[in-house]
Amino acid sequence: MTEADPPAGNRPAGTPHAGASPAAATPAETSPAAATPADARPVGAGWILALTLGVVAVFASWFGPLQILLPAQVDLVSAPGTREGQLALIVGIGAAVSLVATPIWGLISDRIRVRLGTRMPVVYAGTAIGVVGQVVLFTADSGPAMIAGWGLVQLGFNGPFAVLAALIADRVPTAQRGIAGSMFGVGQIVGVIGGTVIAEAVGSGPLGYLVLAVLTPVLLVAIVVADRGRATAKSDGAGPRQPAAGKRAVISVRRFQPTRDYAWAWLLRFLMNLTNAILLLYLYYFLDEVVGATDVAGSVLMVTVITLILSAVCAGATGAASDRLTRRRVFALAGALSTAVGLLLLAAATTIPLVMIAAALLGLGWGLFIGVDMAIITSTLADDTTSGTLLGVANIANSLPQVVAPALAAPLVVSAAGYPALYGVGAAIAVVAALCLIPLRSVR
């Protein structure tokens, strides 16, 4: 489940969504330009762990609020009967900010990498902005203040998320991208669980924002340290660096060169993240109004933990298996179909046990998908020198669902059809996502 990214890759995402999302390919799967990291020296377990911790930090900062902190805070600042619309407005505006910020951060990181051989200044700047947003949310006592704080959180943390996704394209050999991409997905899952646990542990109150404001920078330090030795011009063996072209290169349309398969991979990521956004947006209220949970925050935590533990286990196994088999599409297909079945079951659920069964299916589906998502999306990149920009655009597929989901969900949940219609629509979207794999020819 996700972000959200973002969050970014995916994402993830997703995630990666994900931020975003946040990949491996055989020689037959990639163009020569996309395959340039193939000769990079292998990354170690420590580097992959540091990358994963960075993703955990970003997604905890996104999904602790999305799962519990924002809905609970909206209850305190909104008039009776307006909480659904107020939450949709806050989340939607934040997602719109993310939508714009994600590709811009990616483009900026590309230009910084060309000049300095590292993307880390984007991590520093984005983290600082995101922490300011968390402090604003801690003090917020009105809807506008919450919008401002959440917008800063989305704006800021999309910076490090964009860098984390791009580092896979920069540093990881193609033979390791399945496992690296799956750990990117696992980081999203652990971040969602961690953020939710933190939010529940502090009693669903605004103190959770301060805890995240301290924890997020601490976890992001790991990738800054781990990547320091590699942060030299083309130390990954990707060939000679193209010279910087100044402002003209930044705005040139020629710098953006998506392939047809990139477009299908983008749509696949978008649709899967949309199903996830539909699930998460009103989960708190669904468990309250339809299921009648006595401890709503605790029930959200229970559903989240069940879903995401299964996702994490499945994603890790899927990434390793896809590297060995050099097959990605079959895992993504199984993930989309499992998600569809889980959402259909959720549409019929009125008891906690049935919700838990649906959560297990959704966890399985999300794990299968994010285990190969990053591998699929990076195998379609057309140009190594614009990987940050292209992955930034790919991370829009993590954040755009956060804009679309409120617009789609709010009218459904207040209609006579209610939550069954919402989750039924989500199941249909998952089936359409599965169909996107048919024209995705360059990925096996």
Protein language model annotation of sequence segments:
Residues 81-85, 174-183, 297, 384-394:
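Loop-to-transmembrane helix entry/capping segments in MFS-fold secondary transporters
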Residues 3, 23, 30-45, 230-268:
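Juxtamembrane intracellular "pre-TM" segments in multi-pass secondary transporters
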Residues 385-415:
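A late C-terminal transmembrane helix in Major Facilitator Superfamily
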Residues 120, 201-216, 411-430:
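A membrane-interface helix-boundary motif in multi-pass transporters
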Residues 119-135, 330-345:
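Structural signature of the two symmetry-related core transmembrane helices
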Residues 37-95, 261-293, 297:
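Helix-loop boundary and gating motifs at the non-cytosolic
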Residues 101-116, 314-327:
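Helix-to-loop junctions at the C-terminal end of transmembrane segments
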Residues 70, 159-172, 369-382:
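Intracellular juxtamembrane helix-capping segments at the cytosolic ends
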